Amino acid sequence: MDHFVDERDLQLLQNDRYTFYVLSRVLGGPCAVIRTDHESLILCHTEHPYPVWLWTPDGLTEAEKERAWQLAQETCPMARGYRYNLKYELAEHFIARAQESGVPARIATNMFAYDCPAPIAPETAAEGSLHLCTEADIDEAAQMIYEFHEAVAADQQDIDRCRIHARRHIEHQGFFFWKNADGETVACCSWHPNAGMGSVGSVYTRPQHRRRHYAQHMVYQVTQMIADKGLTPMLYTDADYAASNACYEKIGYVLQGKLCTISAK
């Protein structure tokens, strides 16, 4: 197994460009662990607290599933707290093998990958407006990122780490607030460009301001901005959040793929 990726790996990921969009993006940056055969298995871990990404083609044999399991346990073992983003057919094998190994596992998150070929303006009005964050907003953006991760109970990190991420987003004009009519920051989201797509993420509305269509209008406007740049808008959602997914579908998002995160129980 090689410790580097090249064009062969990026071409493989084109077959799952929606579900493995994040993997194709993070492979271009610093990674703590990379293993690939450039044909049927790519493993990548960036850093804690993020999950390990495991790409495999569809229709794996049992031997191929076991090979992926063994590689994951050699490099980023579940017993040490690592989580994995992977396809469902591989997740089933991992959960069974984890049980046999004495480290029971579960599906922690079911994820949908959507794209938006034609954004649709929301039918219901919302007060306020979109705000592109600048350097002056870094501290508040960091707080919003912190609240987002706490709300979804995934990839939690301290406020200093959130500030680093906020600064990085803002330097690339990639972080937005929705401000209500009183000028309060009530929601946020980010976006990243990569390989002809623009991924919307960190969509969060503060609890006391929900059910007022803020997120729908915010995501629509950012989605339209991405489309206007000639990119294909896409996003990941928690499959179990039916209300949020319905909101995205109303503004033109179409389900393109599914994957999951598994972790020790």
For the regions a protein language model found, what residue spans apply to each?
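Short amphipathic alpha-helix that is part of the acyltransferase structural core
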Residues: 1-20, 120-156
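N-terminal charged segments
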Residues: 1-77, 88-93, 159
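Acyl-donor-binding surface of acyltransferase catalytic domains
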Residues: 48-50, 55-127, 262
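Residue-level recognition of the GNAT/N-acetyltransferase active site
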Residues: 57, 206, 210, 238
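Conserved acetyl-CoA-binding loop-helix of GNAT-fold acetyltransferases
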Residues: 62-73, 205, 211-227, 245-250
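Conserved beta-strand-loop-alpha-helix junction that forms the acyl-donor binding cleft
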Residues: 85-91, 234-249, 261-265
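A conserved beta-strand-loop-helix scaffold within acyl/acetyltransferase catalytic domains
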Residues: 157-203
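Residue-level detector of high-confidence beta-strand sites
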Residues: 188, 256-258
